Design a protein with these regions (language model features):
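Helix-boundary and loop/linker segments of multi-pass membrane transporters
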Residues: 15-24, 53-56, 107-111
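Hydrophobic residues within alpha-helical transmembrane segments
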Residues: 31, 35, 65-69, 120, ...
Length: 147
């Protein structure tokens, strides 16, 4: 007897396998989706990925699937890593808020700094993961098209 999880897994895998278009078209779509999935815009990542896939003429279905890199199981590690990468690029310590007395202006400043670090780190990690995933998918579809 098959479980519901096996059927869903097979459907998703067949959806990935049965995409038409050139390898570059499919790779662009997935890369845009992975890039969009690295940003902390919960609920809008798929919309952003599909929007940008339409702009660059990439595969919309693979763009939507690429945003699944960010899911409830990966939110905390992914965004923590993105924040740390952003902190490295901005080169300032991230825990200075505990050393100060909490004033509203300080909270706004810390929120702005936190957001900038997270978005910068998300951009860097997103570009790297998009390049890696896009390259892998390009070669997968290139090999598939030769068969």
């Amino acid at each position: 007897m098959r479980s519901k999880r096996d059927i869903t897994y097979k459907k998703i895998l067949s959806l990935f396998r049965n995409q038409n278009g050139s390898p570059f078209f499919n790779a662009k779509g997935l890369a845009i989706g992975v890039f969009s999935g690295c940003f902390p815009f919960f609920g809008f990542q798929t919309l952003i990925g599909v929007f940008f896939a339409k702009i660059v003429k990439g595969n919309i279905v693979l763009a939507a699937m690429g945003t699944w890199i960010s899911n409830p199981f990966t939110y905390i590690p992914l965004y923590y890593f993105n924040y740390k990468v952003g902190s490295i690029f901005l080169n300032n310590s991230s825990n200075k808020i505990l050393e100060k007395s909490l004033v509203i202006d300080d909270l706004w400043k810390q929120g702005r700094i936190f957001s900038i670090k997270l978005l910068l780190g998300s951009s860097c990690v997103g570009i790297l993961l998009a390049l890696i995933c896009g390259t892998i998918v390009f070669f997968i579809y290139k090999i598939k098209s030769k068969r």
